[in-house]
Amino acid sequence: MDAKTDDKGAGKCPFSGGSHGHRNRDWWPDQLDISVLHNNSKKSDPMGAAFNYAEEFKKLDLEAVKKDLHALMTDSQEWWPADFGHYGGLFVRMAWHSAGTYRITDGRGGAGAGQQRFAPLNSWPDNANLDKARRLLWPIKQKYGSKISWADLMVLTGNVALESMGFKTFGFAGGRADVWEPEELYWGPEGTWLGDERYSGERQLAEPLGAVQMGLIYVNPEGPNGNPDPVAAAKDIRETFARMAMDDEETVALIAGGHTFGKTHGAGDPSLIGPAPEGGLLEEQGLGWTSKYGSGFGADAITGGPEVIWTQTPTQWSNHFFENLFGFEWELDKSPAGAKQWKAKGAEATVPDPFDPAKKRVPTMLTTDLSLRFDPIYEKISRRFLENPDQFADAFARAWFKLTHRDMGPRERYLGPEVPKEELIWQDPIPAVNHELVGEADIEALKAKILASGLSVAQLVSTAWASASTFRGSDKRGGANGARIRLAPQKDWEVNQPAELAQVLSKLEAIQGEFNGAQKDGKKVSLADLIVLGGAAAIEKAAKDAGTAVKVPFTPGRMDASAEQTDVESFKVLEPRADGFRNYINTKRHQFMHPEEALVDKAQLLTLTGPELTVLVGGLRVLGANYAHSTHGVLTERPEKLTNDFFVNLLDMGTKWTKANGEVEIYEGRDRKNGELKWTGTRVDLVFGSHSQLRAFAEVYACSDAQEKFVSDFVAAWSKVMNADRFDIVAKKQAA
């Protein structure tokens, strides 16, 4: 049969693998989505398995790149002319918005992967016309190729923009490798741009979100929902900036520093703007927001609503922002686009026009700028910066560096000649190795001592998991290195069972002290290493007791962080609301996901795949790693032995599962014939039999010939988690 060629059939995919028609999630929208565990697979990476970005970046002539970027700043292009003859403001905004999606709750977002190139970020209303900034950069990216990623280039360009306008930056670190597909993140519940269904009660912003409306980076510049109230706007500002790890001083510095440069664009009717890049025409070639107002660019540019120029020198670093903020009284005004903004009352026209040197304008501000004057806390900081420009410059330099590097993880990931020497508390510093590490004979002797200490398999496995599983692949925070499980706040987290944890750590510290005290050659073992080694020893014993010999890989080199190197408030966000691997839910905290969704979310943060998630849960259950020694999901008669019993018994058709009477989210597994209670489990346990894909993984491990594969796969997945924060090992392997 010939394919249809009428209009109804036009554009429809004629083969079964196409993207049209209903997908599984359209039919079953409540189905647990585990696709996030398989994003950014090697199949989508055009660089190939052998490519090592860190090694390529080391070959880069950074000064040459910066020289080209400096030249670009004033090389105004006819197709997108530079305001005031300088692209500095545009590129500062590009870098800011690349980094500004970062949120501290789950560490996601940020500049670390170059996601601004992809949907939805490339088409967010708040990112309007940043597609032009990236196109301006393309010749430079093309010139230096794989030696600099888009992620690094966008941040570096923001730095060079600031430097070209007379500002001294704090430094720059490379090392952000690009990804090659959009990140599927929860950006909010809204189905419309600029919707704000994320609020409840007295303007309570839902977690883990950071921005006030869908498609904004932070706050609405016109005020909450367009209400031009600077004091109310300050509340939004404080909340959103706190959710990306900024305090009040950093917030003031960032807003004022960023708004020292450039302008906003609201020259005309916003309805004349075309679709965003993802909805644009094929011939637009990935550009969006094509405007029919006047020329569509330059003096006629429309990016949002406001048309604001903050300072008299928008291409030079100055203190004019604060001088204007406090030097004038402000009256409400409207931009040519109809947006609410403020103009200096009775002021002379001292601000330059971006394209006509013969014209001048009066100073203008956004509602959110005035928040820095009318919020009492911000006002105090702002006046100090007004009177002490050097303090302002230092605060902005440090806050800008934090903004653009917050999601890069520890300093050992920083690359390049401009890495600052100063160690900063938000980098979660860990001491460098300053002693000889334990060798193979020491490792075996220490394992024997640990197993003879009276600590159980369950205690050792639980402690090692608690230490390592704080890792977040999103912002590279957490992990076993540093042994912060012995420090506040982690030692007091409910999930870590503080009383029992203290007993375990006390015994491990005694072993550590005895070993280190007996050495005469400077050799030492850190508690961080000993915690992980304890888990390895326990797993080897549990496997042996199940009849399977295995050696758990162990690489020493972790160090112990101090309380002075640990920001307690910053680490509080790493406390899990739920940890399905330990069958734990914090009933005192609001849960915004079902337990099985939280399990997948945590697995994604740990960079685990679906099979790795599956084998870890099955193994941890039989090893007794559950919170508070709960028996839910411990589907074995042989606890603390590394068997595949969890999968065998979960998939046993001789068991019928029903909800337990009066128990929320607890299920009973009874003998199908006589009704005798055999097991209890949670949603997290039963999902491995209910979800078709997870069940397929579980079936692999439930087979009669699967014991050795199960143990081998469990050890591999376990080792991946234990070493997730060992960037030193990764660097050595990549270099080799």
Swiss-Prot record:
Keywords: Heme, Hydrogen peroxide, Iron, Metal-binding, Oxidoreductase, Peroxidase. It catalyses: H2O2 + AH2 = A + 2 H2O; 2 H2O2 = O2 + 2 H2O. Belongs to the peroxidase family. Peroxidase/catalase subfamily. The keyword Nucleotidyltransferase does not apply. Coiled coil: none annotated. Its EC number is 1.11.1.21. Homodimer or homotetramer. The active site is at 97 (proton acceptor). This is Catalase-peroxidase. InterPro entries: Catalase_peroxidase, Haem_peroxidase, Haem_peroxidase_sf, Peroxidases_AS, Peroxidases_heam-ligand_BS. Bifunctional enzyme with both catalase and broad-spectrum peroxidase activity. It comes from Rhodopseudomonas palustris (strain TIE-1). GO terms for cellular component: cytosol. Residues 1-10 have a biased composition (Basic and acidic residues). There is a cross-link at residues 96-218 (Tryptophyl-tyrosyl-methioninium (Trp-Tyr) (with M-244)). Heme b binds at residue 259. It comes from the Bacteria. One of its GO terms (molecular function) is heme binding.
